[in-house]
Amino acid sequence: MNNPFTLKNKTIVVTGASSGIGQQVAISCSQMGAKVVLIARNKERLEETKKQLSGKGHLSISYDLTDLEHQKELVQGIVSKMGPIDGLVNCAGITATLPLKLMKPETVDELFRTNVFATIELTRQVLGVKNVNKEGASVIFFASIMGCVGENAKSLYSFTKGALISGCRSLAIEYAPRKVRINVVSPGLIETPINKNQPYLADPEKRKETESMYPLGLGKTEDIANTCVFLLSDAARWITGQNIIVDGGYTIK
């Protein structure tokens, strides 16, 4: 019986794969049968992630995606070793919490270069005619609920995530003739190792306050990874140009 949710025989590229959501996306994709290409800056953590993958035939690459000039060679190297790419999950990104008066041009440039420019360039290279599966593919941008709702001192981060949400719609139209689906995943607060050490989760009282904002409680990395697996699979073949909000009900209040 055909299983439209499987990722068997698919090659999936995951950025930011050395920790947090990106790491879990890579693990979950491998569990569903995919060959996974892991990309992140930290080589040691990448290798630790690779050890947790199911199956064989995976590839890990230590690379700083803000090096836009050499992304073409990066993608060519992946395709030469793994064959055409079936899916790209752009998990790599950074955040910032600061008011407008403290936003220096170099800080703005850093966030946009990491969250937006690197994502656009990698997607451009992956979707080259010779690099992507001719039968179709799936691309996922990672935004945030901060691209949909406001929060004090989060405007810079929101600028970058809003750009991905808006751009996704036009790209989805542009690449639909080639059966390439492009969607956005916008998570709420996820209990990653980094977030667990933040005051809003580490402090018991603040954690209780934070949890009260989420009708279904705080999310786990698996919740986001499962959404990505679905969007990468053939089960989502008729979904494109969408911003999938996965936030335990935060934005419905």
Regions found by a protein language model. Give the residues of each.
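Conserved glycine-rich cofactor-binding loop
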Residues: 18-19
